[in-house]
Amino acid sequence: MSIRRHWLSLRLPLVLLLWGWVMVWSTVSGRLDLLLRAVYHPVVAIGGVLLMLIGALQMRVVLRGQAVRGQEVRVASQPLPRGWLLVVATAVALLLLPPRPSFNDLAVSRPSALPEAPRLAFVLPPEQRTLTEWVRLLRTQPDPSLHTGAPVSISGFVFQRPGETPQLARLMVRCCLADATPSGLPVQWPRDFTPSIDAWLQIKGTMVEETINGEVRNAVKPSEIKAIPRPARPLEP
């Protein structure tokens, strides 16, 4: 078998091994935390292991010239799709270039609708509620007077829709970023503080009332604003 023919025979096994490794490594390295809900990470890892096993078995067949039912198995007779180079380039890019999604850009393009909330979240002390739990509570109990003066301790990224004041938000996902839903809280930003879009902040303060276009709503009045690194798992279920 010539070197060229030998290489052609190994293309499919190598591609399977490469993509299997990408899936397993993305799970172990934590990159999937930026793209996929944690409960689905084992599915990706198992899929990667299976791809690597299939690739290894096919490579063994090619290298040993194993015969099946009296006929030599030739992986070269199973041509890869014409875009196989693109498939390989994509896998290499995923290994070399970590994902850096803009949560603000994604949130702007998504509707602000939240799934049903666990009832336990509503009975937590106010200072223990997450940003998402606060949003759910305000939607189920929209009377601003019920929450005015409550202590708040939340974290999230700065999110701004066109023409609106920046909010502090988190992304909710059922599966992955494709079905992400933003949940945001209005913030009365100090005059001497300009929030940077997509920046992650931790805010401590109190819940107050404000009137916007004749509508009374709750907003967070910060007493402390602290820049924080993006969480290892920024997506919330």
Pin down the residues of each PLM region.
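Membrane-embedded alpha-helical segments of integral membrane proteins
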Residues: L10-G70
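Beta-strand/loop nucleic-acid-binding surfaces
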Residues: D179-T194
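Internal/C-terminal transmembrane anchor helices
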Residues: A76-S102
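OB-fold/S1-family single-stranded nucleic acid-binding modules
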Residues: I212-E236
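Short nucleic-acid-contacting surface segments enriched for D/E, G, S/T with interspersed K/R
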Residues: G47, P190-K204
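OB-fold and OB-like beta-barrel modules that bind single-stranded nucleic acids
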Residues: V152-V158, D198-M207
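Membrane-interface segments at or immediately adjacent to transmembrane helices
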Residues: L97-V158
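Short aromatic-glycine-enriched beta-strand elements
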Residues: G163-V173, V216-N218
